[in-house]
Regions:
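Predominantly soluble domains enriched in secretory-pathway, periplasmic, or organellar proteins
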Residues: 1-195
């Protein structure tokens, strides 16, 4: 079967994840949208569009598949879409988390797949800051900040969720810090070499 019968879907600057039920969620940087395309019938895909904010990039789907979260390159904050209730549309979370502070230059944009979710909390890199943000995944409200050595890029959980490992952008890309999730403090700094 030829695929030329399928409708064209803009794919430039697309960042997506597979959802349950042959659905695919993706963010369109240029269009400022999050879309969910249901491919249950590959000959008649159905696409839902949701305004997301300025320049959505990259994304994360929570481990339970419920929430799709896109970063917003053009503004502080993130766009959250409940994929179990998409008719509610997107909502902004962590809006203005950098407001009132002088941001640092950004050397590397963090990837949302490089976030950690452990123990009902999301740990994410604060863009242009020397911090890891801690967010309650029940409310999607910020509940803390953990100071780290430099600008974090990837924030990954140990499989049991007891520790979070953080690597950094230039010039500190040769170091990794380990955060204890109970205390919310850096407990070790490793120097494995340039990444």
């Amino acid at each position: 079967r030829a695929l030329h019968h399928l409708p064209r879907i803009q794919a430039r600057n697309l960042h997506g994840d597979r959802l349950a039920g042959n659905r695919f969620a993706y963010a369109l940087f240029d269009a400022g949208e999050i879309r969910i395309t249901d491919l249950s019938d590959p000959w008649a895909p159905k696409t839902q569009r949701f305004p997301a904010g300025k320049q959505p990039y990259d994304a994360l789907v929570t481990p339970d598949g419920r929430y799709y979260i896109a970063g917003l390159f053009g503004e502080d904050g993130l766009a959250l879409l409940d994929t179990w209730q998409p008719e509610q549309g997107t909502r902004k979370i962590l809006s203005g988390y950098g407001r009132g502070q002088e941001p640092l230059p950004v050397f590397k944009m963090p990837h949302l797949r490089g976030w950690a979710i452990a123990g009902g909390r999301a740990y994410l890199p604060a863009i242009g800051r020397h911090e890891v943000l801690v967010v309650d995944t029940g409310t999607w409200q910020e509940v803390g900040r953990i100071p780290v050595k430099s600008q974090p890029v990837f924030v990954m959980a140990r499989p049991d969720g007891r520790q979070i490992w953080v690597n950094f952008a230039f010039p500190d890309y040769s170091e990794v810090q380990v955060i204890d999730t109970l205390s919310g403090k850096v407990v070790k700094t490793l120097s494995p070499g340039k990444a």
